[in-house]
């Protein structure tokens, strides 16, 4: 990893690099992609949403606690454990993130870090998300608008985010090569 801001580190290649590294340690026939788990029997039988089953010696759930609560587990957890799984908030579960990519991180040539905090959004926290070598350049920001107010406003949010990048980093920020709005509040694997 490398530091992009004091006290925080990023994984070169992003989280997918971590996922790919972990997946490379698993024999391909044993790796199941796009296979949501529907049921786990504590004897080791795992049933997938499509009805397929496997038997596992060990089962590790590395998913948000609220998502664990959506899987049928036999024998069931006691009521207190079930309730605690539902009550544990998913970190970032209600958040949204906007990313804009550019041919290069032009803001660095202006002496700007790409990091910003703002109260006049829609983004409240912005960072340089460029690859370590600077190609492509990328800026991302966390949306500070509550999920209920974001609902159905994706196009307006994209426009407002680009405008905010323009105010902060200049006119070149108004013409990204690619943009993406990721709203975890509506992702069933993140927030339930």
Locate each region found by the language model.
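Active-site-adjacent segment of FAD-dependent monooxygenases/related oxidoreductases
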Residues: 1, 99, 181-184
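Active-site/ligand-binding neighborhood in enzyme catalytic cores
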Residues: 1-36, 43-44, 55, 62, ...
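Generic structural signal for small/hydrophobic residues in well-ordered secondary structure
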Residues: 22, 60, 99-100, 141, ...
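Non-transmembrane alpha-helical segments in soluble domains
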Residues: 19-23, 38, 162-169
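Active-site rim elements
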Residues: 4-12, 83-90, 146-155, 165
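Conserved flavin/dinucleotide-binding core of flavoenzymes
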Residues: 45, 54, 94, 109-192
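Central beta-strand plus flanking loop segment that forms part of the substrate or channel wall
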Residues: 80-110
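Core beta-strand elements of the Rossmann-like FAD/NAD(P) dinucleotide-binding domain
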Residues: 49-58
């Amino acid at each position: 990893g490398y530091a992009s801001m004091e006290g925080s580190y990023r994984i070169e290649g992003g989280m997918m690099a971590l996922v790919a590294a972990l997946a490379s340690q698993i024999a391909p026939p044993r790796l199941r992609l796009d296979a949501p788990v529907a049921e786990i029997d504590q004897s080791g039988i795992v049933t997938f949403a499509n009805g397929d089953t496997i038997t596992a010696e060990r089962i590790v759930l590395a998913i948000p606690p609220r998502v664990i609560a959506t899987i049928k587990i036999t024998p069931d957890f006691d009521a207190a454990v079930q309730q605690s799984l539902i009550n544990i908030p998913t970190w970032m579960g209600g958040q949204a993130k906007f990313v804009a990519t550019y041919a290069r991180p032009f803001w660095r040539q202006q002496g700007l870090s790409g990091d910003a905090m703002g109260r006049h959004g829609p983004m409240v926290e912005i960072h340089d998300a460029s690859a370590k070598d600077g190609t492509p350049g990328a800026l991302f920001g966390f949306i500070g608008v509550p999920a209920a107010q974001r609902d159905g406003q994706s196009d307006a949010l994209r426009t407002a985010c680009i405008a905010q990048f323009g105010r902060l980093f200049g006119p070149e920020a108004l013409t990204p090569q690619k943009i993406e709005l990721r709203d975890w509040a509506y992702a069933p694997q993140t927030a339930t």
